[in-house]
A protein has these predicted regions:
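WD40 beta-propeller blade core
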Residues: 17, 65-66, 108, 153, ...
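Short loop/turn segments that connect beta-strands within beta-propeller blades
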Residues: 20-24, 68-72, 112-116, 156-159, ...
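Loop/turn-rich, solvent-exposed surfaces of beta-rich toroidal or solenoidal domains
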Residues: 106-107, 127-197
């Protein structure tokens, strides 16, 4: 879910709803789906301003959509091909574009435009770089994507070209957070990695073991504090 001011946005068993944070009252419901095997979303909604219009970006099991946060009106919707609807990562806005990728599909960059009060989206390019569960970080016009193949790659957002792909990494999942030209990656096996956003090569600066059990929860950052939740505990570290 996404907490934004006095609202909570949730993608439940079918569609997306906006709730009052204080009371739990449903403010609106949108994008109702059939439910069942293809209902409900793995992804999380995110707020962004694209082409001058405030958006709630929502990735369902079959499509990436832009909604009006106040009303739930669907501004645009673009199909995203997946295997069994596994759209898991959170879409990432960059300028007036949105990057996403899906299991069993491809990576996509969609551009958002506004003309005569109407907002629309179109696909700018696709790439074979296929993410799985890990939401990419976007730094200086490049996406750093942890792939289904357990490799990290760098994608040029202007062209969709893959600049490099790392050798195989043991972990299935990374959660990543950017800070300037560096980013942190927490592996599901409890390793915290510090990497430089290098468009020429995989650039690992340092890594340490921070957990004794699996760490599937996303990294949480509060100022210079890094919060890491493992199966049976919570740890805090300082990021300098």
């Amino acid at each position: 879910p996404l907490v934004d001011g006095e609202a909570v946005y949730v993608q439940p068993g079918a569609g997306v709803i906006k709730l009052d944070k204080a009371t739990g009252e449903t403010i609106w419901r949108s994008m109702d789906e059939d439910g069942g095997m293809m209902g409900g979303a793995f992804s999380s909604p995110i707020r962004a301003k694209l082409a001058g219009q405030e958006h709630l970006l929502v990735q369902s099991r079959s499509a990436l959509c832009g909604l009006v946060p106040e009303t739930g009106e669907v501004l645009w919707s673009k199909k995203v091909k997946t295997f069994r609807g596994m759209n898991i990562l959170t879409p990432v806005p960059y300028g007036d574009t949105v990057f996403t990728s899906a299991y069993g599909g491809r990576g996509h960059l969609f551009g958002v435009e506004s003309s005569d009060g109407a907002v629309s989206a179109s696909e700018k390019w696709t790439t074979r770089a296929q993410a799985y569960m890990s939401t990419p970080v976007l730094i200086d016009g490049h996406a750093y994507v942890y792939l289904r193949s357990k490799r990290l790659c760098c994608v040029d957002l202007a062209s969709g070209d893959v600049k490099w792909t790392s050798s195989s990494i043991a972990d299935e999942y990374w959660s990543m957070v950017a800070n300037g030209d560096r980013f942190l990656a927490l592996t599901e096996s409890g390793e915290l990695c510090l990497l430089r956003a290098n468009t020429e090569e995989f650039d690992l600066i340092d890594q340490i073991e921070v957990a004794d059990s699996e760490t599937w929860a996303h990294l949480a950052i509060d100022g210079d504090q890094i919060l890491i939740r493992e199966l049976d505990g919570l740890s805090a570290f300082t990021w300098r």
